[in-house]
A protein has these predicted regions:
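Carbohydrate-active enzymes and regulators
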Residues: 64, 77, 85-86, 123, ...
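Beta-sheet entry/capping signal
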Residues: 283-285, 289-291, 299, 431-432, ...
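C-terminal amphipathic alpha-helical interaction region
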Residues: 2, 6, 10, 18-26, ...
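Active-site cores of enzymes that catalyze phosphoryl transfer or operate on phosphate-rich substrates
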Residues: 372-382, 386, 419, 424-427, ...
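Catalytic or ion-translocation cores adjacent to nucleophile or general acid/base/metal-coordination motifs
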Residues: 302-333, 519-673
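Often metal-dependent polyanion-binding catalytic scaffolds in large enzymes
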Residues: 2-462, 472, 630
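Expand to "…catalyze enediolate/carbanion chemistry for C-C bond making/breaking, isomerization
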Residues: 293-296, 476, 480-481, 598, ...
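Short glycine-rich or small-residue beta-strand-to-loop segments that form or flank ligand, phosphate
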Residues: 112, 411-413, 498-499, 539-542, ...
């Protein structure tokens, strides 16, 4: 008997044709066939779920509305003069007006779900096209890629040595911010992620009918679960909730994406210039920052305790990741001294740990004496556990450099005993993680408005010994005291920037320095790079109105010539960070005026920095949407005034776009690249 079982929506009748679509050149129409198939199939699944969950009537209402609106769109596309013809739109409005509240909610939810699924399909297609571009070496590389950039440099006559020297000057720091209207729940985001994983699985060829059916069933189950799930939070997220939402992207994608960035750099140099770079000698090209838990400007819910919570949660996350990685290393590094050698340095430190640290659980048993790496990693695991539970515990690592030192011993021992491949595959990526994230994961910026500092100085008097009468001033002083204490409790690099919103004069910067010193905050840096003991606390003026942008160069000239400020500049290695506000300048002067004034301010700040021997690092406070100063980050970097880029740049990554940029490792890697 013939089976009535329907054919899987994604079934590949011709595997070769499917492969041709997936690898099509960027100028071939077939490249979009997989996207169309995904959108069509996801829409069909949503329709099935809609009938099952809400009935045929709701499905027909959605379909009728969809048909009318598509017909209206196509009519206008063919005949623009008919855009004013209301016939089709009136029919759609009539259908909506007849709905009761329950039906309207279900129809709205159906359209929202459709657009969510379409977005997932488009995101998967971006990943698909990125893979295809890597296969297609005959066509020009994607704009913004390492390979494309190096090719342009080579064609411009820049040598491999000069290109490598330029690379060593670069540091990019995405700074995550909270999204005040973020209502999407993590459970919903994770369901979307699982659907995306199934879409990616459907691109793996050969795709059997059974595999296609299994993926389809998984997607159908997730869509059903999505339909039965509350889409948004029923209560406003707390500051701690916002902190957790920002941290989840490290676990979802950034820990995986980071080593791939450096591998892509090395491969691109090898392919374009024929130059073999040692990945271990590359500088840290990427660091991360956050405002979540430290942004007090206009947010009364961000208390000094929130700063402590943000640092604690970030530290706990990165230490948990290191524990997982060391455990994974222990599984893999089973090299025995009966088969290969181990360095004397590693054996000596292992002996020291065995003599001085008690109560260590040896993962592979106390009698396993020949597998020295595993024994050593057991002690490293124990020391990390102690660090996570209490930074002051006797057996804890005092800082990330001690942990890195142990990893370097393992790395060196492997390389000197015919284990170079093991070191490259298993240890190098963890070393890069430690050099990037330390024990603090990211720097937490503190932000407050200039008028709050001015009001506090007025209350406290010239000697800063008056009583803080207002709650606002009391909280401000508590914040500075918390900064002083937390920079001693946590890695000092956890807090190193203080953003001054609404900055208009050099006095706004000097006010922060006075308040910080009065609270015993170490403002001056004790070293000039990330390996120093304490980088201090650099005040960062944020120029965000049109008038303040026009005055920015003059303000910084006066600040840099101030005798009180000169020693601080020296302590920071002559670096100065200045922030430019895109969103507020857009609101103040409009998009065109804002863009032009930002350009001029950047150019003037650069000229002023050259005059005073200052190394300028700009912090671009860009919104997520175009209306808030958002847009393609790569294009924004290219649009900077010629000759005005120091190699270091910080850019806000707004909460409303974090999910679309960093929820997936492939997209996170591409965004960072």
């Amino acid at each position: 008997m013939a089976s009535n079982k329907p054919k899987p929506l994604w079934k590949a009748d011709d595997q070769q044709a499917r492969l041709t679509e997936l690898t099509a050149h960027s100028d071939e129409p077939a490249k979009d066939n997989p996207l169309r198939r995904d959108v069509r199939s996801l829409g069909a699944i949503l329709g099935q779920v809609l009938v099952e969950q809400s009935g045929q009537d709701v499905f027909e209402s959605v379909e009728e509305l969809r048909r009318l609106l598509i017909e209206h769109r196509e009519t206008v596309r063919r005949s623009p003069e008919q855009a004013s013809s209301p016939k089709l739109m009136l029919q759609a409005q009539e259908i909506v007006s007849r709905m009761d509240l329950s039906r309207a909610y279900q129809v709205t939810k159906a359209f929202a779900a459709y657009f969510e699924l379409t977005n997932l399909a488009e995101t998967n297609h971006r990943k698909r096209r990125r893979r295809a571009a890597k296969l297609d070496r005959e066509h020009p590389p994607l704009p913004g890629s390492f390979r494309g950039t190096l090719l342009r440099m080579k064609e411009s006559g820049i040598s491999a040595e000069n290109a490598a020297a330029a690379l060593r000057q670069i540091t990019i720091t995405p700074v995550f911010t909270a999204h005040p209207t973020e209502v999407a729940r993590q459970t919903v985001l994770l369901k979307r992620r699982r659907i995306a994983q199934q879409l990616e699985r459907l691109d793996r060829l050969p795709l059997t009918a059974e595999d296609a059916e299994d993926c389809e069933n998984n997607i159908r189950a997730e869509v059903t679960s999505l339909w039965q799930t509350d889409e948004v939070r029923l209560a406003k997220p707390t500051v701690d909730d916002e902190i957790r939402m920002g941290l989840r992207y490290f676990r979802l994608s950034l820990f995986d994406a980071l080593p791939k960035i450096y591998a892509e750099v090395v491969e691109s140099f090898r392919e374009v210039y024929g130059l073999d770079l040692d990945e271990n000698t590359l500088p840290n090209l990427v660091h991360f920052g956050s405002w979540i838990g430290g942004d007090r400007d206009g947010n009364p819910l961000v208390k000094p305790d929130c700063i402590r919570d943000a640092l604690q949660m970030a530290r706990a996350l990165i230490l948990r990741e290191y524990l997982n990685d060391v455990e994974s290393l222990s599984d893999r590094l089973s090299s025995s001294r009966r088969q290969t050698g181990v360095s004397e340095e590693l054996l000596s430190r292992l002996q020291h740990y065995e003599n001085t640290i008690a109560g260590v659980h040896l993962a592979w048993g106390p009698h396993n004496t020949t597998e020295s790496y595993r024994r050593f990693l057991s002690y490293m695991f124990h020391k990390l556990q102690q660090s996570r539970e209490s930074a002051g515990a006797p057996a804890a690592y005092r800082d990330a450099r001690e942990f890195e030192d142990d990893l370097l011993l393992v790395n060196s021992s492997l390389r000197s005993n015919r284990g170079e491949r093991l070191a490259q595959t298993y240890v190098d990526s963890l070393l890069r993680m430690v050099r990037t994230f330390g024990f603090h994961l990211h720097t937490l910026d503190i932000r407050q408005h200039a008028r709050v500092h001015a009001h506090a100085l007025k209350e406290l008097g010239p000697e800063l010994k008056g009583d803080a009468r207002s709650a606002e001033t009391k909280e401000l002083l508590d914040t500075f005291r918390a900064i002083a204490q937390l920079k001693r409790t946590y890695p000092a690099h956890s807090i190193r920037h203080y953003i001054i919103s609404g900055a208009e004069s050099e006095n706004d910067v000097l006010a922060v320095i006075r308040l910080a010193k009065a609270a015993d905050v170490q403002v001056a840096g004790s070293a000039t790079d990330v390996h120093g003991d304490d980088p201090g606390l650099m005040p960062v003026p944020l120029f965000e109105s049109i008038d303040s942008l026009r005055a920015a160069g003059s303000v910084m000239r006066r600040l840099w010539s101030d005798p009180e400020y000169q020693p601080l500049l020296d302590s920071w290695g002559r670096w100065q960070e200045v922030m430019l506000g895109y969103s507020d300048s857009n609101k103040d002067g409009g998009m065109f005026t804002s863009t032009w004034e930002l350009y001029k301010a950047h150019r003037e700040l650069h000229h002023a920095a050259q005059e005073y021997g200052v190394k300028l690092r700009l912090f671009h406070g860009r919104g997520g949407t175009v209306g808030r100063g958002g847009g393609p980050t790569h294009a924004a970097i290219l649009a900077q005034p010629p000759g005005c880029f120091s190699g270091q740049i910080r850019i806000t990554e707004q909460g409303e776009v974090l999910n679309w940029k960093y929820a997936d490792p492939v997209l996170a890697e591409w965004n960072l690249e």
